[in-house]
Amino acid sequence: MFSALIKKIVGSKNERELKRLWPIVEQINNLEAGISKLSDDQLRNKTSEFKERYGRGETLDSLLPEAFAVCREAGKRVLGMRHFDVQLIGGMVLHQGKIAEMKTGEGKTLVATLPSYLNAITGKGVHVVTVNDYLARRDSEWMGRIHNFLGLRVGVIIHGLDDEERRDAYNADITYGTNNEFGFDYLRDNMKFALEDYVQRDFNFAIVDEVDSILIDEARTPLIISGPTEDSTDKYYIIDRIIPLLKKGEVVEEEANTLSGKRKRYTGDYTVDEKAKSATLTEEGVLKVEKLLKIENLYDPRDIETLHHVNQALRAHALFKLDVDYVVKEGEVIIVDEFTGRLMPGRRWSDGLHQAIEAKEGVKIENENQTLATITFQNYFRMYEKLSGMTGTADTEAEEFHKIYKLDVTVIPTNRVLLRPDFPDVIYKTEREKFNAVIEEVKELHAKGQPVLVGTISIEKSEELAELLRRQGIPHNVLNAKQHEKEAEIVAQAGRKGMVTIATNMAGRGTDILLGGNAEAMSKQWRRSNPEVSEEEFTKVSAQFKEQCVKEHDEVVSLGGLHILGTERHESRRIDNQLRGRSGRQGDPGSSRFYLSLQDDLLRIFGSERVSKIMDMLKIEEGEAITHGLITKAIENAQRKVEAHNFEIRKHLIDYDDVMNKQREVIYAQRREILAGETIRESFVEMVNDAVADLAEGYAIEKVSATEWDWQGLSESVFKLFGFHVDIPPQTMERLNPGNLRDLLQEKVQEVFSEKVTEFGDELIDHLIKVIMLQSIDAQWKDHLLSIDHLKEGIGLRGYGQKDPKQEYKKEAYQLFMDMMGRIREEVVEKIFWVQIAREEDVERMEEQQKRQRLVFNAGDEPQAQQPATSKKVGRNEPCPCGSGKKYKQCCGK
């Protein structure tokens, strides 16, 4: 009550923020008349003027009013679009490094031109991040016209570009691209062998479109660059064949003489927990699997991998559904994004799950992959000096944005009042009743000509509904992951009179639904069908389409605008709001309603008990619908439960990934330092000194006479690392202590290294140090990532031993990292001290071979091995081409 009173007096935080920005809007508006009198050249020259003023010490904040006024004028001249006052506020919020929540149709794409123009003045680059290649290309061409007019260069990063094209795009003033491409480019850069091969610049300022989709929905999926392992794929087929023979059971609670008075009994061969997305073998199931696979003990350490594959095969059959979680296209299993309904080619589930699903569907099984480089979107975007974002729905996740990204959300008012009533949910007992009601409403609205957008949560449901409409003879379009090529075309026409469109999740579709249809899209489509027509004919047809759409627009408005019909609530309220948000844009009329049933996943898994009780209490019969505030509240509570659960998963992921992130930063910084080559000799000498100190410490025991030290062990270790034996006269030996032993060894090691430098020359020795360091770091880092994966898998079990798994993970991951750094040091020192003079072509061949051993993602899509150059393959027992004098298998072929 007190907080409500305070809010009434001083306004909410959002209201105070908007109040602070309105005077700056006034400043920009006051500049408009003067700016509009400038010629095109004078307007363009303003960019150079701003750069000079910034160079002389003026801040971007002081340049903002004039820069925004210039950008607004360019928009009017080039695109015929003038930024509204609320769009200026949106631009200021983005410039401040915050999230601007702007409703659908409020022109987020145009808003981004303001802060991107202002921040491009620094010359440090601006990244505008979108969810797919289509939007990246469209926005760079469309909005890029404003920036090009003002003398700035615009680049675009999309799938299929080579490194030269990528570098050129990143060097532009403003770069449009997808989150995946930006992330993969970062990982690929940190696998390269020369700084000049890097494509990205420093991380200055990013504007993330559909920020909730990228930073929240996709945050659970890390970006991974991987190479295939050599494991056999037969095991997946063998295990897949036994899963249909297992019987699904359930968990039964029985009364028992226990503390709680109850105990759980498991029936069948396995049980499924849909909330936790897990499937577990019962005791009976374990015995049955052992019998079917002819193994004695499934939990024997030798068969632990088989147990893992059985569990993954169970999940594949019990939890992952065709046309819901994935599709099979051209003999390949492709993941469907659960939030946007888009296909995600190139993405694979890890840990053998993807292979289990491939076996289930009877398609070719690809080998499991080993991680070579990985990063989460959370940690990638936190590298930017300044980060901001736009979306139609961020306020529900404001707490998460603040906690994880330190980003505040500002809700921007709409330019025109929202006229869309959102009707209460209608709930039925069964899905069949619900779908019958949906069909009846669609039939009724279609008959009077009102356009309808029907939202479903999976491909399977969209096709089921489409079949029901087909039987009723109602013409309709279907938009799901299978028809994504026609996406923009279908969405653009969804507002036409009498149009019925069925769509899976509408998140991030990026195309406005215009009432009466989109004349521009219709013209483009007509031109594609009639490529031979003259420009004159095309202009004439375009004018006809325009006239037709204006007429239809008025008719559709009089019918009530676009009606949104949701057929199921999503786990996230945000996705529901995004579906609703497709209607009522820019003051247009519209309406929305959700039809639900107790058999829907959300209600069945998270809220059915409470809702069922309410329906029983209200004595709802089959076939009868209910609209009640209590039900709506129960559904929203179920959604909040799921959202909180998903937030915990993401927070858990980032807590674990933060450990890896610090290690990744150390390794990548070390690689960059080596590639820069300025301190490479000093780094190597430091490694040598550390190795000597470790040897002295390991063999020279403080309180034991020097004559009793393990001299043979020391001599062998020194020989292994540095290539010489320790030969100390007995009289000298007696006077030694750990400190002067270290000095003695250091002196001898420096002498041997100086001889190497004299023999090879400074240039060649530095080159060899660089090549060998990179080779060791990359090989050891790859193995370290595998060790970390294994550590993650088993760390949860520490909880049973009364230990905090997170703390144990941090401790052990740190120890693994330190062990890896020790191995890198030993490997580098040993190889340099053992290296022999080799011909220049041998060194080049070694470098080439080292590059070929790596696997890189081709444009962020699928892993492909680089084509090997034509050269003789080195046998494992042949001398190593690096010139170390060792066999290849004991040197670079390890």
UniProtKB/Swiss-Prot annotation:
Keywords: ATP-binding, Cell inner membrane, Cell membrane, Cytoplasm, Membrane, Metal-binding, Nucleotide-binding, Protein transport, Translocase, Translocation, Transport, Zinc. SUPFAM superfamilies: Helical scaffold and wing domains of SecA (SSF81886), P-loop containing nucleoside triphosphate hydrolases (SSF52540), Pre-protein crosslinking domain of SecA (SSF81767). One of its GO terms (molecular function) is ATP binding. Residues 854-894 are annotated as: Disordered. InterPro entries: Helicase_ATP-bd (IPR014001), Helicase_C-like (IPR001650), P-loop_NTPase (IPR027417), SEC_C_motif (IPR004027), SecA (IPR000185), SecA_CS (IPR020937), SecA_DEAD (IPR011115), SecA_motor_DEAD (IPR014018). It comes from the Bacteria. May bind 1 zinc ion per subunit. ATP binds at residues 87, 105-109, 512. GO terms for cellular component: cell envelope Sec protein transport complex; cytosol; plasma membrane. One of its GO terms (biological process) is protein targeting. Zn(2+) binds at residues 880, 882, 891-892. It is a peripheral membrane protein. It is found in: Cell inner membrane; Cytoplasm. Signal peptide: none annotated. The keyword Magnesium does not apply. Its EC number is 7.4.2.8. Part of the Sec protein translocase complex. Interacts with the SecYEG preprotein conducting channel. Has a central role in coupling the hydrolysis of ATP to the transfer of proteins into and across the cell membrane, serving as an ATP-driven molecular motor driving the stepwise translocation of polypeptide chains across the membrane. Belongs to the SecA family. Monomer and homodimer. Part of the essential Sec protein translocation apparatus which comprises SecA, SecYEG and auxiliary proteins SecDF-YajC and YidC. PANTHER family: CHLOROPLAST PROTEIN-TRANSPORTING ATPASE (PTHR30612:SF0), SECA INNER MEMBRANE COMPONENT OF SEC PROTEIN SECRETION SYSTEM (PTHR30612). This is Protein translocase subunit SecA. It comes from Geotalea daltonii (strain DSM 22248 / JCM 15807 / FRC-32) (Geobacter daltonii). The gene is secA.
